[in-house]
Amino acid sequence: MGEVLIRMENISKEFPGVKALKNVNFEIKKGEVHALVGENGAGKSTLIKILSGVYSKDSGKIYFDGREVEINSPKEAQQLGISVIHQELNLCLHLTVAQNIFLGREFVKNGVIDEKKQNEEAKKILEKLNVNIDPAEYVKNLSVSRQQMVEIAKAISMEAKVIIMDEPTSAISEKETEELFKVIGELKKQGKSIIYISHRLEELNRIVDRVTVLRDGEHIITANFRDLTIDDIIRYMVGRKLEEKYPRVYVNRGKKILEVHGLSQGTRLKDISFDLYEGEILGFAGLVGAGRTEVARAIFGADKFDKGEILINGKKVEINSPIDAIKNGLAYVPEDRKLTGLALNLSVLANITLATMDNVVNMLSVINSVKERKIGEKIIRDLKIKTPSLFQRVQNLSGGNQQKVIVGRWLLREPQIYIFDEPTRGIDVGAKIEIYNILNNLKQEGKGIIVISSELPEIMGITDRVVVMCEGRITAILETSKTTQEEIMYYATLYKKERSN
């Protein structure tokens, strides 16, 4: 690591009703991978948005390569050499890899874009990263991890000195994560600085040099990563020692409430059969693309299936739409809460009552605002949703609080069966435990809960049984207390192994 490249001193930022940052200090050295961690709402995003020119600071100073600078726009940040790779990737899917890399800076010859030259230059950048991607391939045909590589190549093409990566591994597999870490290693060798934001603390020791912890808008500590344990970091993040990472409750399971028999859907799902009991958390494990989300969407009526049957409380039901599923006592919390789970421009209150409007309108279909408000206040209180007010736009909440809003919406309908798809993706360790406690409360109430998760420690920590999938098939249904992560991974790759043999 070299000398300090960026130094932020006493940075403060206030929004209506919220002090987002309070005299925060942060620095990154040349050729350093520096982790920025903290609970949702700690101030990480605000600090990064100030550094990348999205927000202006209220007070404080920023130094770049020894000189004080003002960063008033994303363009000014780019001119300094600061690039951001967001969790939601910023690519044009209908353009090629090369076209995305040089978008707005095309190679032009005789008034026409020189595609050949553009592809050649893109290939050079990708080779520099040791990444094998065809520059002429359309981005829409690439996996999320490959699209990330295109974003990194784009940053390099703009001569980025600092690359900010926001939750880069949240939607990619373990193998793809390894590839990303190799690329980060290459960037480090080239003297690039990486600010790495992640809630997956266990992965940081593989790439990170130093770590800075924020809590409630304040700088808590900056230290060499090797001098801290994961438990130390968690304690600095939440301000207390967490006794249990995966709180568990034991309940005598009740009757069988859901049966799925022979569910098939083209080539995506093949003969899916399983059951779910009252007071049970049933996990679904498997690699990316195994078909877990497809099962959830089929059961909930979001996607059609070709054959098979669904029984609830022993009776066959026809579920052809989400409305049918809701009428039959099912709730679904999707993996992409921002895209399909929330109305981001609406208030917290509107999102909570979205699925139960019949409870808050009178005979003239006019909303009873007093009744609606009481319902919203109860959900916020019961689930400990952190929000300045009921009328705050839900897009301004942290990931963990957004997730609680979706859960609260379904609680009002009192469903019998809950399906959670990646319920803790992109949320911090403290918020994760709050989500686990909500699941445990539902379990104690005798609800049946399906949890789809790509994090095996989470599957092992909170479920009673686990359904393992590979390539659209169920390869095993295991008692969680009697299995291991290694056995789950064996069954998660079973058909891949057979094919390779």
Swiss-Prot record:
Occurrences of domain ABC transporter (ranges): 6-241, 252-496
Catalytic activity line of the entry: D-ribose(out) + ATP + H2O = D-ribose(in) + ADP + phosphate + H(+); D-galactose(out) + ATP + H2O = D-galactose(in) + ADP + phosphate + H(+)
Alphabetic keyword roster: ATP-binding, Cell membrane, Membrane, Nucleotide-binding, Repeat, Sugar transport, Translocase, Transport
InterPro entries: AAA+_ATPase, ABC_carbohydrate_import_ATPase, ABC_transporter-like_ATP-bd, ABC_transporter-like_CS, P-loop_NTPase
Keyword Lipid biosynthesis: no
Matching SMART domains: AAA (SM00382)
GO cellular component: plasma membrane
Name of the featured protein: Putative ribose/galactose/methyl galactoside import ATP-binding protein
Native organism: Caldanaerobacter subterraneus subsp. tengcongensis (strain DSM 15242 / JCM 11007 / NBRC 100824 / MB4) (Thermoanaerobacter tengcongensis)
